Every structure is written in structure tokens, then in C-alpha cells.
């Protein structure tokens, strides 16, 4: 799956904003990964190098899905996040993605999917700061 990011923070987005090609590979989650995921990342880099003409290899074609529409939900204030979905999960429109509660207990909200799609990531930490990412989902 490919996601064309519109993020304005982080080193990979800084490079892209400066016209420098950038690639962010994300596999695993919660700081955990498998040796198979590491091997897949290495193969992705080799595939990119092949595409750019840096190396010449024959790779089996893998059909990719490009996420063209994505939503990145963020915390509106410091608080607590209770995710109800996991990365990779398919969700329907209006599905409950998680619940957010402000630190002072004055604000509560349910975060629901605005459209059907696939969860790209979810924050698994309980405590979140204002503007921290909560969950992202998208569709082709």
C-alpha cells in the first residue's frame, strides 16, 4: 500500500518540501518488528533503486494499492486515547475508531470514520498531547 503524505512535520516531509525525493517505509508497530518485515523493507529499497536505474534486477511485479484519500485524526487537547481499531483493519463509514477524553474530563468524543477505508495506523499510547495523532485511515 502506498500513501502520498501531505504531512508538514518530520524529516521525510522536510526533504519532499525541499524537492528532495523521500521514502518512509513503515512496517510493524509499537516499536516491534519481525525479521520478515525487515527483509521486506530491504527488498522495497532494492526495488526503488532498480526503478531509479541504480541497480538492474528482475523483481516479480507486486500490485500496490495507492491511498488517494486519507484522514489523520488528532487530539484537540491533552487527554486520553482509547483506540477501537488496529492498523490494517478495514472499517465502514461511521465505524467507531476510538474514544478521546480530555485530561480535565470536560470533553469526550467518539472518533468515527467519515468514509469506508483501511486503518493506516493508530496511536496505542493512553496519554496524548494536543495535536498528537490518534488514528489515520484512507481509501484508494
Predicted regions and their residues:
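Structured catalytic-domain cores with a bias toward divalent-metal coordination
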Residues: 1-140
